[in-house]
Amino acid sequence: MNFDFSEDEKMVRDEAARFLRDNCGREALRSVLEGEAPYAKNVWQGLCKMGLPGTAIPEEYGGAGAGHLTLCLVAEQLGKHLAPVPFSSSVYLGTEALMAFGTEAQKQAWLPKLAAGESIATLADIETAQVLTPDSISVSVQSGKLNGKKLIVPDGAIADIAIVLARSGPESLGLFLVNLKDPSVNIENVAAIDPTRNTATVVFDQTPTESLGAGDGWLQLQHIYNRAAVLMAFEQLGGAAAALDMAIAYAKERFAFGRPIGSFQ
């Protein structure tokens, strides 16, 4: 059985690797860490021009329809080059939620914009510093209006829409689609442990919202987590590969006692 990647998958991987190698070096990362910009806009625009945010989005919604394995290969390259862009929040979380649970009207309205990078999505779930459980959710929806506060929202200050986990009844949770540009939404940047990742506190005050399809919001959230975990694992794989490459290069270049230190192993 052949477990190798297809030619199309290899092509997308190699194009992503080439672009990131040429445009996402240490300078791009340092400009975000030391500057005012929340992410590397030129890198993000380049990724969008290549259609990479729409890798797994079906063609009928403006995406490439290339599937999640191809998206995993893109994620690996993003991790390898530490790309400071809102890819994980918009693609792994927001877009995945819309594709899995959104209504047809919601998909038609937002997936083409997300595929082109014209809009950025995120997921708002956490409310406390403790482990997230169904009982810890107090943000609620009544009569189509959302109220409450969400913490550590990835790229919350730059996203256009959010998929919000909220209480729809005393014993029920749901996922809701919210326009973060609505004036009833208050957003405050919060410093993250990883400065390459932007997070925000988001407060909703009678914010208009609509249900993201139907179903148990908690079970839907686990589905989103599972998909995102695989994609984040590929980012980590890319980061580990980059660290190994740096270690090997150092072992070849660093001399001790007249020999490269790698020769002592």
Predicted regions and their residues:
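Glycine-rich beta->alpha junctions and the first turn(s) of the following alpha-helix
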Residues: 2-12, 52, 80, 185-265
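Short secondary-structure junction/hinge motifs that connect adjacent elements
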Residues: 27-49
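A short, Trp-centered hydrophobic/proline-enriched beta-strand micro-motif
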Residues: 117-128
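Internal helix-loop-helix
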Residues: 48-108, 112, 116, 154-161
